[in-house]
Regions:
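Long, charge-patterned amphipathic interaction tracts in eukaryotic proteins
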Residues: 68-136
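Compositionally biased, low-complexity repeat tracts
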Residues: 9-12, 18-20, 116, 124-125, ...
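Short, surface-exposed, charged/polar-biased interaction segments
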Residues: 55, 59, 69, 91, ...
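N-terminal interaction modules that seed assembly of large macromolecular complexes
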Residues: 27-91
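Intrinsic-disorder-associated interaction segments
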Residues: 27, 38-41, 63, 67, ...
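N-terminal amphipathic/basic-hydrophobic helices that include classical n-h-c signal peptides
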Residues: 1-27
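Glycine-rich, aromatic-bearing surface loops/beta-hairpins
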Residues: 127, 131-174
């Protein structure tokens, strides 16, 4: 399965006509080191896929195939410099405003803190367009899997990543 994902992902990257996301995508992926930064926070690609599948609604695609397709979409999205930079922003904000200031007024993700949702919605829309904003709301409210364990910025950023990718998957199934 790993070999299949690797081959499929290489094919997706090779067939992409966007010069920023196509051939140069390796540069952006390494520039932000976003996958590695997320993993340091305990957020693995498999955990993201598992959370995505927590609210997956079948559109005629078997769960195993959907899981595989989502993994490919997530990996591809992480190579987009816009998505990666927004995720990086969430990582840094989480470190600065949540981890370093455990006793601050945002420790419990208060209602007046909106920037975390804005980041999540921006990631979702960047990947999946307007439909992804509604999908983001589902994941933000239910917080399946790893989302329930993350702080206020990363839970929304990862929910946005999931929402964008699931929205694209659903659109392709219709």
């Amino acid at each position: 399965m790993i070999i299949f994902l690797s081959i499929a992902f290489e094919h997706i990257g090779a067939s992409c006509h966007n010069p920023i996301i196509g051939e140069g995508s390796h540069y952006f992926s390494k520039m932000f080191e976003i996958e590695e930064r997320l993993e340091k926070k305990g957020i693995t690609i498999d955990a993201i896929v598992e959370a995505a599948m927590g609210l997956y609604v079948s559109h005629g695609m078997p769960d195993e195939q959907a899981s595989m397709n989502l993994k490919i979409k997530i990996l591809k999205s992480l190579k987009d410099p816009n998505v990666s930079s927004l995720l990086l922003g969430a990582v840094l904000l989480e470190e600065e405003l949540y981890e370093k200031r455990k006793n601050s007024e945002i420790a419990e993700d208060p209602v007046f803190l909106l920037s975390d949702e804005i980041i999540g919605m921006a990631i979702a829309e960047c990947i999946g367009g307007t439909y992804a904003r509604f999908e983001f709301t589902r994941y933000d409210q239910k917080k399946p899997g790893i989302l329930a364990t993350l702080g206020p910025f990363l839970d929304d950023a990862v929910a946005g990543l999931i929402a964008g990718c699931t929205s694209r998957l659903y659109s392709e199934c219709v």
